[in-house]
Structures are given as C-alpha cells and as structure tokens.
C-alpha cells in the first residue's frame, strides 16, 4: 500500500487519511491538516493496487465507512466526510 507521509510539527496524534485522488473534500481535508502543521499519513485508495484497495475497502466497511475522506485518529476514532469541527476537536486544534 502506498502510504504518503506529510511531515508536520504537531505529532500528538497518529492520523491516517483514506482519500480518493479525485475527491475535492479529500483534498481540502489534507490541505486543512497541512495548513495546521499536523503530521499525518494518507493513502489515495483509488490509486492503490487492486489487492490493497480491496483490503482497505473491507477494513473501512467493517467500520461502517462507505465514503471519503475517512480520517482515522489514533487507531480508534474515525471521522468520515469533510468535518472540520470534528477534526479540530479530535486533534485538539483551535
């Protein structure tokens, strides 16, 4: 799986973004995190190999996640969609 790391000063939380390369809300979510200097990783699911894509989609389905972006924080909280207030709260941002 091609996971991309975006370095940032804020490393208080483990953040993984599941995105689609063509999704404007996914792009905005990644920009939001980068602008706030959050260290995070992302994977563009539509660009993953067929095997990786199936595994990712199966994992997300088990979490009742059927849309993007999906932001997994600290391996326990999942935020689905472009929800800035939820991201700010979960990441303790202003």
What are these regions (language model features)?
Residues 24, 48, 78-79:
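Glycine-/small-residue-rich active-site loops that bind phosphorylated ligands and cofactors
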Residues 24, 51, 86:
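Short alpha-helical
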Residues 73-94:
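Non-catalytic, surface beta->alpha helical segment in thiol-disulfide oxidoreductase systems
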Residues 2-39:
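Local sequence-structure signature of Cys/Sec-based thiol-disulfide redox active-site neighborhoods
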Residues 45-66, 91-93:
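Thioredoxin-like thiol-disulfide oxidoreductase module
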């Amino acid at each position: 799986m091609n996971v991309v790391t975006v370095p940032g000063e804020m490393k208080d939380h483990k953040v993984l973004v599941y995105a689609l390369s063509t999704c404007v809300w996914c792009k905005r979510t990644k920009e939001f995190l980068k602008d706030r200097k959050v260290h995070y990783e992302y994977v563009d699911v539509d660009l993953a190999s067929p095997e990786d894509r199936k595994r990712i989609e199966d994992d997300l389905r088990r979490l009742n996640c059927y849309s993007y972006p999906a932001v997994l924080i600290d391996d326990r909280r999942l935020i689905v969609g472009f929800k800035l207030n939820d991201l700010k709260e979960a990441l303790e941002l202003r």
